[in-house]
């Protein structure tokens, strides 16, 4: 297993733990917000497990990159305009949220680097006689 994949696994696991720990408090804000945090925790934990048990192939890092990008985008919306059904009022920015977003950003960049590295390392096949 590679160090980069380990970084993505760590980012998934840390963010899963944080989202899971924050889910009960977000249920106080509304059922939708609580469910969103619980689902994101489960998805991140599942990704950490998937990347650990089945590390081969481009699909796990691609899904991880997509999930991290979605979490970062949803937080940007939640803090600027709010999210219509889940959290209609803009959420205040706090230190724990910023730390979580830092882990997600590291996970996103590292997952994308795994995809880029895989694309670059594909062997070029030359036709015979050239």
Model-derived regions: residue spans:
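Membrane-interface extramembranous regions
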Residues: 1-130
């Amino acid at each position: 297993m590679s160090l980069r994949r380990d970084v993505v696994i760590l980012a998934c696991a840390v963010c899963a733990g944080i989202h899971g720990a924050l889910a009960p408090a977000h249920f106080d804000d509304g059922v939708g917000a609580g469910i969103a945090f619980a689902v994101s925790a489960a998805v991140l934990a599942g990704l950490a497990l998937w990347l650990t048990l089945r590390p081969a192939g481009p699909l796990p890092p691609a899904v991880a990159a997509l999930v991290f990008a979605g979490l970062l985008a949803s937080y940007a919306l939640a803090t600027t305009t709010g999210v219509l059904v889940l959290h209609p009022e803009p959420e205040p920015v706090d230190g724990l949220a910023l730390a979580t977003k830092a882990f997600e950003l590291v996970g996103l960049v590292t997952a994308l680097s795994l995809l880029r590295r895989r694309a670059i390392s594909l062997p070029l096949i030359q036709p015979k006689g050239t």
